[in-house]
Amino acid sequence: MYIGRFLVVGKTQQGKPFVSYRVSSRSFPNRKAVINNTNDTVAILPNDLNDMFANPYIAYNCIKIVGNTVIATNGTHTDIIADKIKLELPIRDALALSLIAMDYEKDDYNTPRIAVVLNENTAYMGYVADNDIRIKEVPLKDGLAYYLSTYECCRISTEHQNIVVDGENPEEICKFVMDYEKFEKPVCCATATIDGDIELGTL
């Protein structure tokens, strides 16, 4: 099944909070996830930078760390949400203001913007589509995670969209998410785990 770009948020079997973001793409598969020099941001970049002239939505920061909080999204709203978190807005408010302001992507598919904000004790998922907007706190339970995608599964459901993720560090979780055969067209992945410190990994 093709569900496009998606986020996975939850806890590992050993109780570490994590969030993963996977790019799945039919149109622009030649992309990579790159961690910046200060180890607090992951960017999605095309292998050929000229591709950015063909589509403005294919390059963006997908993960950003602000203090003890991780912001993960499928677009440039990562930075907008992160700025609100820096200003110490509550997570719900930071998500709501940012998603309303940015709105869905104005591409051929009206692609929804999806987002997760995570810290050691709290996880929120949110999205804005052309006909819907929602923000919801989701429970963090050891060994359980939830996914939210741009297509087919753009809804927040802890009952029907849950997944047991294998892995304890960012690289292992990235590999699991990339290899997850139920969802087609994997391109690249980025993961943040919280275990005292926040660690980043890509694949």
Swiss-Prot record:
InterPro entries in alphabetical order: IMP_cyclohydrolase, IMP_cyclohydrolase-like, IMP_cyclohydrolase-like_sf
EC number: 3.5.4.10
UniProt-listed Pfam families: IMP_cyclohyd (PF07826)
Catalyzed reactions: IMP + H2O = 5-formamido-1-(5-phospho-D-ribosyl)imidazole-4-carboxamide
One of the protein's GO biological processes: 'de novo' IMP biosynthetic process
Top-level taxon in the UniProt lineage: Archaea
Transmembrane domains' residue ranges: none
Pathway(s) this gene product operates in, as recorded in its UniProt entry: Purine metabolism; IMP biosynthesis via de novo pathway; IMP from 5-formamido-1-(5-phospho-D-ribosyl)imidazole-4-carboxamide: step 1/1
SUPFAM superfamilies, sorted: Archaeal IMP cyclohydrolase PurO (SSF75569)
GO molecular function: IMP cyclohydrolase activity
Keyword entries, A-Z: Hydrolase, Purine biosynthesis
Job of this protein: Catalyzes the cyclization of 5-formylamidoimidazole-4-carboxamide ribonucleotide to IMP.
Record-stated family: Belongs to the archaeal IMP cyclohydrolase family.
Protein name, UniProt field: IMP cyclohydrolase
